[in-house]
Amino acid sequence: MNRRPVPFEIGPVHFVGIGGIGMSGIAEIMLRTGYQVQGSDAKPSANTERLEKLGARIFIGHDAKNVEGAYAIVYSTAVKPDNPEMVEGRARRLPLVRRAEMLAELMRLQFSIAVGGTHGKTTTTSMVAAILDAGGLDPTVVNGGIINAYGTNAKVGAGDWIVVEADESDGTFLKLKSTVAVVTNIDPEHLDHYGDFEAVKKAFQDFVENIPFYGFAAVCLDHPEVQAMTARVENRRLVTYGVNPQAEVRAHNIRMGPEGARFSVVIQPRDGGFISFDDLLLPMAGQHNVQNALAAIAVARELGVSPDAIRKGLAAFGGVKRRFTTTGVAGGVRVVDDYGHHPVEIASVLKAARAVSEGKVIAVVQPHRYTRLRDLFEDFCACFNDADTVIVADVYAAGEAPIEGVGKESLVEGLRRYGHRRVLPLPAPAGLAALVREEAHPGDLVVLLGAGDITSWAYALPGELEALSASGGAAAE
């Protein structure tokens, strides 16, 4: 396959932080299309190991000498200006390319679908890819999470379409000039970058209005801010979806069960026509995932995917790593790992957990970033209603300095003030298994929530619970 975005032979492209989920996907696509790729990261990971096997040169640790011989440097917002590789790149006058700019270059080569929204981007991107695959369109995919069906977050397809996750966190998603845009929802998030919610809303409107006159945007009419945006967007075609009776692609008769969600869909475009799908199966729990599936259905129908392929693609959807992923069952207690770290995401995940749990729902939360906890504190205090017990860990700083009065203790106090009946602070990760063992009984579901290293706790917990059960003792603090 020859999809080189420039007409020249260039040397190695160096990625600073190549193991990151967004960076690794772009690097993989470039490797698979014949580029020389190298990069550095602070520590080895599954992503760096995969890229190395594909031919990338990987450096562990950041050092100025790593960029010797590089043609250009790709970086993300997470990379600080004083990173030695960035300093050396500027000294050598190498092109410094933002991650979104490099993704935009790859998107230029195909018709593109960019999936945006405050929440649900990764899952929706994966669902769009799955249905297009089922319909024989074989898309290229660059996602913000590991797609279980691929075992990776990126895939080079032979078809005309590329499906990408559009990350709004630093505003650079506006560089992605897509043929098709998706907006799942718009909530207050990344206010450290945008300053206020009005700027967030304006960015998503610009994202939609970036599409060409022949493209379209699929937007979720269930979300009030998205619905309000539809009134402001001019000269661009919108396809609405949701459970809202006014949506053109809408779900009804939604049922949750052990196998996931079952629902029916009616498609009624405003210019006429009627299509219905009865009793679709999505092997994921939660109404929010039904909404994500509706986005994928809306896009697929516009691209001509058959109803049968849509049905098969959804039924076979294998999910995304860290999106309601079961890590094990110990003594009848199911342990689930989820990336949810915003109050809206947490509430949706816990509602899904409540729908499928045979017993209690126990939430373990590791707040992600002090600024997010501070800016959305009241929302955090109100988003755990579907959890019978909430266990609160220390904040995962993600490079931020602590903020006085913002942390584990304040969230515990806030949850209790908001009326939550059982909230427990986690003294240390080593004590989690003992605490869960005291709370959980067969049939209960324990969901670990956060974007930090809590995922490692989720994978360790089933074994630790089994060990405690076998020994009859308590975990060491």
UniProtKB/Swiss-Prot annotation:
Q: Where in the cell is it found?
A: Cytoplasm
Alphabetic keyword roster: ATP-binding, Cell cycle, Cell division, Cell shape, Cell wall biogenesis/degradation, Cytoplasm, Ligase, Nucleotide-binding, Peptidoglycan synthesis
Pathway this chain belongs to: Cell wall biogenesis; peptidoglycan biosynthesis
SUPFAM superfamilies this protein is in? MurCD N-terminal domain, MurD-like peptide ligases, catalytic domain, MurD-like peptide ligases, peptide-binding domain
Q: What is its EC number?
A: 6.3.2.8
Residues where ATP binds = G117, T118, H119, G120, K121, T122, T123
Q: Which reaction does it catalyse?
A: UDP-N-acetyl-alpha-D-muramate + L-alanine + ATP = UDP-N-acetyl-alpha-D-muramoyl-L-alanine + ADP + phosphate + H(+)
**Matches recorded under Pfam families:** Mur_ligase, Mur_ligase_C, Mur_ligase_M
| Chief localisation class | cytoplasm
GO cellular component terms, alphabetically, are:
cytoplasm
Q: Which InterPro entries match?
A: Mur-like_cat_sf, Mur_ligase_C, Mur_ligase_C_dom_sf, Mur_ligase_cen, Mur_ligase_N, MurCDEF_pg_biosynth, UDP-N-AcMur_Ala_ligase_MurC
Taxonomic superkingdom: Bacteria
**GO BP term (any one):** cell wall organization
* GO MF annotation list: ATP binding; UDP-N-acetylmuramate-L-alanine ligase activity
Q: What is the stated purpose of this protein?
A: Cell wall formation.
Q: Could you say which protein family the record assigns here?
A: Belongs to the MurCDEF family.
* Record's protein name: UDP-N-acetylmuramate--L-alanine ligase
| The encoding gene | murC
